[in-house]
Amino acid sequence: MKGLFLVVFLMWFVSQMNTEETEEYVQFNVIEDPYPRLPRRNYSCSTMACPARHICGCMPTPITPETPYRDLDCGCYHEYDMMPVCEGL
């Protein structure tokens, strides 16, 4: 009986260790912004509401010295010419 209790306790203990490791792994697996000085980009149209006669679209960003990689920037565009909507208007 003591052996069965010991086996059950050890199985529970190991499962708790695995749970804690998983939580720590998820906690430290946060992707940091490689360029924190730049404005944050929208990577999806799923949560974006655009005004009438506009559509949400994702355009590739230009490659610059500050951002030497291709990225996507999603936002509202005029539906007839795909020009970005001015933020202040």
From Swiss-Prot:
**Where is it made, tissue-wise?**
Expressed by the venom gland.
| Gene Ontology CC: one annotated term | extracellular region
Localization recorded for this chain is: Secreted
What's the main place this protein lives? Answer: secreted
SS bonds (residue pairs): none
Q: What's a Gene Ontology MF term here?
A: toxin activity
Q: How is it modified after translation?
A: Contains 3 disulfide bonds.
Q: Tell me the first and last residues of the signal peptide.
A: 1-22
* Entry keyword set: Disulfide bond, Secreted, Signal, Toxin
The record's similarity note reads: Belongs to the scoloptoxin-12 family.
- Put simply, this protein is called U-scoloptoxin(12)-Er1a
Q: Which organism is it from?
A: Ethmostigmus rubripes
Q: What is the lineage of its organism?
A: Eukaryota, Metazoa, Ecdysozoa, Arthropoda, Myriapoda
